[in-house]
A protein has these predicted regions:
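Conserved catalytic-core segment of nucleotide-activated headgroup transferases in glycan assembly
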Residues: 68-82, 224-225, 229-313
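Acidic donor-binding loop of glycosyltransferase active sites
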Residues: 130-134, 318-340
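Structural alpha-helical scaffold elements that stabilize or flank donor/cofactor-binding regions
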Residues: 126-128, 183, 240, 316, ...
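Active-site and donor-binding regions of nucleotide-sugar-utilizing enzymes
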Residues: 25-227, 252-254, 267, 271-272, ...
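Short hydrophobic helices that act as membrane-entry/anchoring signals
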Residues: 2-36, 40
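Nucleotide-activated donor-binding/catalytic signature segment of Leloir-type glycosyltransferases, i.e.
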Residues: 104-112, 295-327
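Conserved hydrophobic helix-helix packing surfaces used for dimerization/oligomerization
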Residues: 58-59, 135, 247, 280, ...
Length: 340
């Protein structure tokens, strides 16, 4: 099945994906930015590689977007302690590439780049230029031709923060599971978040020699560290959160909101919100205007006891129990306010 999926992926899925992305980029600024950022990718990469210490080995850490980059930081910090590596952080999404911030002590050891289109020629050139000793994929953004070429060259690959989400259709449907088995089988090590996920992946990859280990979730390490590090800059006026219990929901999607909003609404309808002095800070994964308007409309139509205000309008705060973050790049700083 591995050969079958390789053919389907390269000759059917990728061309259709590229064509659809090209068409929608005419109307979607994010897709347009992705194509623009990749236009002179290898010229950019060739210049950036020269800034790294060539006596050290290069490690590529691939992140889909900004959230995955934050999850990668504990890994970067640990590997950097050895003093043996440069880091090449690759992104699929423009929001990750544009808004990720490299800590000052690491700037001479890290370069950022877009991941190229997953065609065999582009993948080969990317590996030739970056010359990685290892590649670490954060969570789920796996590209078959890249993994396949890394495998053929004997370059070590690891996927971390892997989660087997049995609630989602693509983790239940036999056809999609067959594809996932093929792509995960190219990785040398799969790091999962807990023992339950380990059992699911062992079942999925039965008959293969993949190493599956429980590493936990680096997201929680990153959040814990962010809470410990105090910031001189106050992101929220102290009066807003004084004597409040703060619940921070980071990088949320629609499915998260569908679970969280009914709970907040019920707590508020029973008067418990005031009794608990509860304020929820919601940071959508992609705080576009469309996303924000959808959230606000959803709240207005379904949850009468939730009163929301955008972060950019906090100067008008009047006791709302939900603060919606409408900008990018401050989530880690918000965790210091969290009680939950």
């Amino acid at each position: 099945m591995k050969y079958f999926w390789s053919i389907v992926y390269s000759f059917l899925f990728l061309p259709l994906f590229w064509l659809a992305a090209r068409v929608f980029s005419l109307f979607n600024n994010k897709l347009k930015a992705g194509f623009k950022g990749r236009k002179d990718l290898f010229k950019y990469l060739n210049a950036k590689i020269l800034t790294l210490d060539n006596s050290k080995k290069n490690i590529i850490i691939h992140c889909a977007s900004l959230g995955e980059f934050e999850q990668a930081k504990p890994i970067i910090d640990e590997l950097d302690k050895t003093g043996k590596y440069n880091f090449i952080i690759s992104f699929f999404s423009p929001s990750g590439f544009n808004h990720s911030k490299i800590d000052t002590p690491l700037r001479s050891k890290i370069i950022k780049t877009y991941l190229p289109y997953d065609s065999p020629p582009a993948v080969n050139k990317f590996i030739d230029v970056t010359n990685p000793a290892a590649v670490i994929f954060i969570k789920y953004d796996l590209w078959m031709n890249l993994l396949k070429e890394l495998k053929s060259r004997g370059i070590f690959t690891m996927v971390v923060n892997s989660a087997f989400d049995i609630r989602r259709f693509k983790w239940k449907f036999p056809v999609s599971l067959s594809y996932k088995k093929s792509i995960y089988d190219y990785a040398d090590v799969i790091g999962v978040t807990d023992e339950e996920d380990k059992l699911h992946f062992r079942k999925l990859l039965r008959g293969t020699e993949r190493e599956i280990e429980v590493f936990g979730d680096t997201k929680y390490e990153r959040i814990s560290k962010a809470k410990e590090v105090s910031s001189d800059k106050a992101l929220i006026n102290g009066k807003v959160l004084t004597d409040k219990n703060v619940f921070v929901v980071g990088s949320s999607w629609d499915k998260d909101d569908d679970v969280i909003f009914p709970v907040i609404d019920k707590i508020s309808s029973n008067g418990l919100s005031e009794e608990l002095s509860l304020v929820t800070i919601l940071a959508p994964h992609e705080p576009t205007e469309d996303t924000l308007e959808h959230i606000e409309y959803d709240i207005h139509e379904k949850y009468p006891h939730i009163k929301s205000i955008r972060y950019s309008e906090l100067n008008k705060y009047a006791g709302e129990n939900l603060i919606i973050i409408d900008c990018i790049g401050i989530l880690m700083g918000l965790y210091k306010y969290a009680h939950v």
